[in-house]
Amino acid sequence: MSRKKAVILVSGGLDSTTVIAIARSQGYDCYTISFDYGQRHRAELKAAEITAKAHGSLEHKVIRLDLGAIGGSALTDTSIDVPEEETSGIPVTYVPARNTVFLSIALGWAEVLGALDIFIGVNAVDYSGYPDCRPDYIAAYETMANLATKRGIEGERLHIRTPLINLTKAQIIQQGLALGVDYRLTVSCYQANDGGEACGKCDSCRLRKQGFEQAGVADPTRYAF
């Protein structure tokens, strides 16, 4: 009997690395995909490749896109500063249409592979307030995916799996550690240096640091200071 196949979106960060481990623990053959989309640094892409290999990815793809061409985000436009204090509302680190674009390409690869499951590490608890990380968005995207694909209209239902959606950052870390995730290999910082060292000031660093504190485990993050 052949194993189930899944496409896993990986960024090299804490959440998506945990998702690979979860998918493997659920018996999936994992095919991982990352995106070089014009983000501020490439350290996360290196981390994505390393963590995908560490968790047994059968194939890892890096898709090149230029979301910086449309701008509108501090992650793709260096003229917009990454906030180093908590802000209200949707922050400037939100990348317009990012998850929609990423999921669509992952969906295409899933069709080619014959995979019916796509995993993404979105979270609606300890997160930055991005609209494309909400349960309503994921449910709507899954509906669209089943209307827009050959296998979907032939009755083989595709699923967008979001195992972290209702977990706190501390719970994510605890689950990952139980599955053998080495968080030293991950890069979460919005403005990490070329060596993957974190700024310790951005929203992503704040949530990550808070998560390790609340989980009661030492923070393995390498900081630039």
From Swiss-Prot:
Pathway: Purine metabolism; 7-cyano-7-deazaguanine biosynthesis. GO terms for biological process: queuosine biosynthetic process. It comes from the Bacteria. Keywords: ATP-binding, Ligase, Metal-binding, Nucleotide-binding, Queuosine biosynthesis, Zinc. Pfam families: QueC (PF06508). Coiled coil: none annotated. Catalyzes the ATP-dependent conversion of 7-carboxy-7-deazaguanine (CDG) to 7-cyano-7-deazaguanine (preQ(0)). This is 7-cyano-7-deazaguanine synthase. It comes from Cellvibrio japonicus (strain Ueda107) (Pseudomonas fluorescens subsp. cellulosa).
